[in-house]
Amino acid sequence: IDGTERVLALDENTGEVLWSHTWRTSYRMLMASYAIGPRATPTVDDDRVYVLGATGILLCLDVESGAVRWQRDYARDYGTSVPTWGITSAPLVDGARLIAVVGAESDGMVLAFDKYTGDEQWRSVKVAGEMGYSQLVIYDAGGVRQLIVWHASALVSLDPDTGNIYWEQPVDVGAGMAIATPVKGGDYLLVSQLYNGSTMMRLNPDRPTATILWQGQSRNPDQPEGLHATIGSPIIIDDFLYGLGVNGEIRGLDAKSGARIWEDIEMNAEARAQWGVVRWGTAFMVRQGDRYFMNSDEGNLIIARFTPSGYEELSRTSLIEPTASAGFGATRLYDRLVNWSHPAYANRHIVHRNDREIIRASLAAADYQ
């Protein structure tokens, strides 16, 4: 299956298309029902924007014109095996470097490029399986900056300056589905997945090491305990963990032990009434003061609070129509419609998209009085 991918630059206030850039690619490596275009969010850095296609076409473009400054092809240049559901991890700008999950055979799961030229600066982590789908993130812990990488075999901490490994913890990831971003709260570091639930690490506050605090014991996402977050990343507040399980249930857990303290199924009540089971339930959560903006896969913008006592929904509005099908394999095209695109927040507005449109809506209270 051949396709055309593109990036658009729009005027923030009017939505006018300022420029676009397209490139040809082949989706033959992907499951056919997922041959639907790029997944990774564009990364803007000064006068450059970095974009990544679903098959590993990485481009550095000029922000003003869309002109190509440099380009790499993961499969052609590095021997990358494109995973079943496409390449999703957006490159991360760190100083003069651009760091990316590349899966370069056989010793370059992660590569650092000169962000101005595209020249390779370092590579790290042996490729022992699929690259996964999780986003790179840098956290301060143990007196250093740690680049956290979650791929389909392990959770790894690297020195972002050199690529040297600080620590590495093997994690059994079902079907290569390392998707949600690793989440830090205090000395806690969490990853969560569909089949094996959550793994909580304790970060050493004095040096760059980590140990397992607790780990989910069940491969069954329908089990009543723990948290099997699949796409949307959970959150950690003090000594408590909150997240959306694969069946659309919101759960609160004790971060120290992993024990469930409450469950709420009302957020997806409408979809649950229509479909029975909200498989692949997803919401993207962004903190705003003592509350969270939540974008549900039904296209709703929800404002809510999470406490050890439960989930408190403050407001909800239908923001955008879900247009993509959830699920797995051939049956995906017959499942409920979802929106798995993460929105952007800027200048008291939210910008969101589906397969058909891009919208911008005000979040300013004064606009609704």
Where are these regions (language model features)?
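Noncatalytic, solvent-exposed loop/strand surfaces
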Residues: 1-369
